[in-house]
Amino acid sequence: VGEPAGDEGRAWRTIDELAALVGAYCWLEQRIFEVTGAWATGPGPVDEVAELRVWTAAASRRHGALAGRWAERLPVRAGVEAAALVAAPEGPRGLAEAFEELEATKEPMVGACAFVETVLPWVGGVYGSHLEIATPVSEGSVMAVLVEARREGSAEIRSGRSLLGRLSEAGKPSGHLGDQFKRAFAPERVSPAVRPG
């Protein structure tokens, strides 16, 4: 489908495009909330990974709150069901499946490594790319969440790497899940939905 005349190279989003992005961000943060929450409360020996459980519980709380902030920014319009906008993005392919595999892992250390080394940096890249082309006039409230999410995400990556470095001294977890996420995200560093038009 060609672009309408006069829209070539436009740097703005329609309300429908922005709504789809915010819905995808909400879905993404909800999935992170669910996965990290499951690690924090899942079965297994508590003493062996107590510090990791505390860290994943904090991550779950942060991403749950972020999902709530995205949900607050979904448009309220006649004929548009806001909850229906919360859906997995079309790209990258395999994202929903990668989250299912991440959630199904029985080894919290393996999952946390994939989360810290691949998922969080990718999410930060998506948010950063959106910020680069966002317009304050029409996306001011969205930009505020993006800025906060990137700042907190960077701190979360640093604390996660520090924790995993201390915990993995006893034994290096396999990279299987990290590789899965890298394959899911490799073709495109940023979700194609971030780019307008």
Identify the residue ranges that each predicted region occupies.
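Acidic/His metal-coordination segments adjacent to aromatic residues that form catalytic metal sites
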Residues: 3-23, 86-119, 187
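Helix-loop segments that flank and shape redox-cofactor active sites
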Residues: 31-58, 125-142
